[in-house]
């Protein structure tokens, strides 16, 4: 039934630092303590490299040169290895209580991947999933994913390359996957595709694959 769909509030944060993004995610995570407060935080970050928690710490000898490029470096409580966030990248942090959807982290990640594949398709880019996490166009990753889930409340999420400066990725092995590259909507379509243009496609696909209603404050 239409009325039984979960309601998810879309929050557009604009350009915010990675640290501020972490702080705001925690604010929305905490709101779930008093009841369902499903939220979808959308933002862009200034240049920043982030590492996950499930693997060996990235050595300082490899992090310091990244700071010299003018980027911040942070360790986050998400899965995955090192990746880059920066302007021109649509970052989406779903803060959902999976009890209101399906209490399965595997299902959740699969729905995120389907969401991005559909969004890319509606823009004219044929993207796929692979044994590696994220969404790909051939051997090039167009969207990175890394999530955290505590007591079935999600945080962190995905980063879709729209018109990102891809040269930032040349200084790392994105997500620790050797022999693979990165791409963007702009590169694939050979025209400029902004975060503003891509956002409604991602939101429509999210509502479809998570079977939810999206709302925004006027």
Identify the role of each PLM range.
Residues 2-4, 10-13, 100-143, 147-218:
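Long, positively charged amphipathic alpha-helical accessory segments at protein N-termini or as interdomain linkers
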Residues 1-137, 141-142, 193:
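N-terminal lobe of the biotin/lipoate ligase/transferase fold
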